[in-house]
Regions:
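Active-site acidic-Proline motif in GNAT/NAT acetyltransferases
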Residues: 105-107, 111
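Conserved GNAT acetyl-CoA-binding A-motif
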Residues: 118, 125-137
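Conserved active-site tyrosine of GNAT-family acetyltransferases
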Residues: 147-148, 152
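Helix-turn-helix
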Residues: 143
Length: 185
């Protein structure tokens, strides 16, 4: 992993394609915490830790293949957050990417870590020529407020898009943000 420090001693590093098993397990613990905290990120509660480990193992394979970049925030020896960017493989869409799975441990929210992870992903995407990022997030969620404050543009809402961790169908909001060369043009 390569690192960039946000505020207050937390270090954000890019995940490589062969992390130690202990890191995959810590990332799984973060995923379980995020789901059990009510975030709608594709999983239902209770999320089994083994399923979370398996999901992260798949993400590591995607990182190794080059279709996904992941940044991990650590505070000392604890994993406290993560964010990913999925890169399309089609020739007509290589200018854009999708921001995915922004997670901050419940004990570490409200300290600017989500904003630091988001800024890291935006900057890194722009550095490799991405000019447009997009995402979807549960409408009305704390994450949506973060994206609004960070200058993302909401383009619409899809009703009953995905179930929250408790199985209730919730709407999602679609957002985009121009980055890199598109911002300075």
């Amino acid at each position: 992993m390569t690192g960039a420090p946000p505020a207050s001693g937390t270090v954000i590093s890019r995940l490589d394609g062969s992390p130690p098993r202990s890191l995959v397990e810590e990332l799984a613990d973060l995923l379980v915490d995020t789901v059990h905290g009510g975030a709608s990120i594709g999983f239902l509660a209770p999320l089994d830790r083994a399923a979370a480990v398996a999901w992260w193992e798949e993400r590591v394979n995607a990182v190794a293949a080059g279709g996904l970049a992941v940044w991990v925030a650590r505070d000392g020896d604890r994993v406290v957050g993560t964010v990913g960017v999925v890169f399309p493989d089609k020739p007509n869409s290589r200018h854009r990417a999708e921001l995915v799975k922004l997670m901050v441990h419940r004990d570490d929210r409200g300290q600017g870590l989500g904003r630091a992870l988001l800024a890291t992903a935006e900057r890194a995407a722009a550095d490799v020529g991405i000019t447009l990022l997009h995402l979807d997030t549960e409408t009305g969620s704390p994450a949506e407020g973060l994206y609004d404050r960070a200058g993302w543009t909401r383009i619409g809402t899809i009703p009953d898009y995905a179930a929250d961790p408790h199985g209730t169908l919730r709407p999602t909001s679609i957002h985009y943000k121009r980055v890199g060369a598109a911002v300075s043009a």
